[in-house]
Amino acid sequence: MAWFLCLSVLVVLVLALAALLWRVRTRDRPQEAPSLPYLPVLGSLLSLRSPHPPHVLFKELQQKYGQTYSLKMGSHQVIIVNHHAHAREVLLKRGRTFAGRPRTVTTDVLTRDGKDIAFGDYSATWRFHRKIVHGALCMFGEGSASLQRIICTEAQSLCSTLSEAAATGLALDLSPELTRAVTNVICSLCFNSSYSRGDPEFEAMLRYSQGIVDTVAKDSLVDIFPWLQIFPNKDLRLLKQCVAVRDQLLQKKFEEHKSDYSDHVQRDLLDALLRAKRSAENNNTAAEFSAEAVGLSDDHLLMTVGDIFGAGVETTTTVLKWAITYLIHYPEVQKQIQEELDRKVGVDRPPQLSDRGSLPFLEATIREVLRIRPVAPLLIPHVALSDTSLGDFTVRKGTRVVINLWSLHHDEKEWTNPDLFNPGRFLSADGSSLTLPSSSYLPFGAGLRVCLGEALAKMELFLFLSWILQRFTLSVPPSQSLPSLEGKFGVVLQPVKYAVKATPRPGCHSGLFPANP
């Protein structure tokens, strides 16, 4: 009996020790992220059926699966990140590990198989392109007088259009006017040229841009199941047609630049890329790689410029449209911005970049627009380049990671009443300076894949809005209801079209200040 008791105690001790060792060994071992149900071939598609757009659905799903969870898109493993801590780990702490990009059918059509910056995979080619484009942008630089003149020229032209409409009592759809203004800024940066109203080339550009916005990055089935390309596909056909028009316009600009290029003059971004290509070609005997090896083929030059051109126009234009939409919904905010402009700038000169520090409420309003309606609610997916981890979860090489910026910017634990438009959340208690109340704010991304045009976009948003609001009060015609705040999901989250009534402010010259302050 005694031996049986001793044996029982020994067995219990061994089992307890084994359990303890198992707990110690597994306590810190990363686990798989919680997963939505999935089926062979289909993946989690059946679990993603919803009347809501993806960014809203992904935010709702965290109530069941947690802030970070996984799903299957066909055969692809995808992790959805809804919290700023894991988002910053992807973008900053492990930025190089998560710097990859997925290859999809639609983005390959758009970028000639990834020969651009936004959708291009992480590589020596990508790093070289980014370095060149960054250098060209720095040539103009934040606060640069030349870039300020370009933006103010377009702001003046935009205000002229609003004045003409006001004089005849017309309400305008501002979408094409804002697009033309921003397009001309980017054209000056990329091509050293601009468009006038009604220009046939500009009208063609509007059509192809909208077609691309309507077809790319919609999680279309052909991106999940590439073999579906063999069947007729209206969206894919439209995308190819729009890209063909875009490429024809880019090729025209490219040939014009090559014909009158000079090593002694750098007029714009395309000149900077041509110079880098020629420099690499002339020095390739001493280098370990040729111009082709670092990606400086004509295709790469065109796609890099097209990338900056396309992204720079659509995103900034969309933010401006959202800003105007919210200012119409919140006339008290519009009035407060105008009062700030009256005090700090007056009516005898136009606003300029040096006024930014004196106009904190306008700057806070821009930040709030970027928060409440992030132009890209789902950041372009990242890809893990090696086996790694994310928080407590293991991540295998090749896993796609989607950061849901919408969730970050509407997190109830980080933002008080996140669905309420409130520029004051970005101001100090006395309203005299800007603050950042939460780390859950990444309107331009961060890290290796941060938006290259962040500084330029902020300059444009400030100057366009300050010029308009100094001169006009914006509203909708009495017969029209307030515009929807829901938006249309695509490459960017766009507001719906509506007409805007611009009323000249008493005492302000809706006429024209010099464009070169």
UniProtKB/Swiss-Prot annotation:
Metal-binding keyword on record: yes
Task: State any GO BP term from the record.
Answer: steroid biosynthetic process
Family in the record = Belongs to the cytochrome P450 family.
Q: What does this protein do?
A: Conversion of pregnenolone and progesterone to their 17-alpha-hydroxylated products and subsequently to dehydroepiandrosterone (DHEA) and androstenedione. Catalyzes both the 17-alpha-hydroxylation and the 17,20-lyase reaction.
> Whose protein is this, by species?
Oryzias latipes (Japanese rice fish)
The molecule here is called Steroid 17-alpha-hydroxylase/17,20 lyase
The coenzyme or cofactor needed here is: heme
Principal localisation: membrane
Top class in the EC scheme: oxidoreductase
Q: Fetch the SUPFAM superfamilies from UniProt.
A: Cytochrome P450
Q: What InterPro entries does the record tag this protein with?
A: Cyt_P450, Cyt_P450_CS, Cyt_P450_E_grp-I, Cyt_P450_sf
Pathway field of the UniProt record reads: Lipid metabolism; steroid biosynthesis
PROSITE patterns per the record? Answer: CYTOCHROME_P450
Fetch the PANTHER family from UniProt. CYTOCHROME P450, FAMILY 17, SUBFAMILY A, POLYPEPTIDE 1, STEROID 17-ALPHA-HYDROXYLASE/17,20 LYASE
Q: Which reaction does it catalyse?
A: a C21-steroid + reduced [NADPH--hemoprotein reductase] + O2 = a 17alpha-hydroxy-C21-steroid + oxidized [NADPH--hemoprotein reductase] + H2O + H(+); 17alpha-hydroxyprogesterone + reduced [NADPH--hemoprotein reductase] + O2 = androst-4-ene-3,17-dione + acetate + oxidized [NADPH--hemoprotein reductase] + H2O + 2 H(+); 17alpha-hydroxypregnenolone + reduced [NADPH--hemoprotein reductase] + O2 = 3beta-hydroxyandrost-5-en-17-one + acetate + oxidized [NADPH--hemoprotein reductase] + H2O + 2 H(+)
For the ligand (heme), the binding residues are 451
Localization per record: Membrane
User: Keywords, A to Z?
Assistant: Heme, Iron, Lipid metabolism, Lyase, Membrane, Metal-binding, Monooxygenase, Oxidoreductase, Steroidogenesis
Provide the E.C. number(s) assigned to this enzyme.
1.14.14.19, 1.14.14.32
Q: Which GO terms describe its cellular component?
A: membrane
Q: Which residues form a coiled coil?
A: none
Instruction: State which gene encodes it.
Output: cyp17a1
In alphabetical order, the GO MF annotations are: heme binding; iron ion binding; lyase activity; steroid 17-alpha-monooxygenase activity
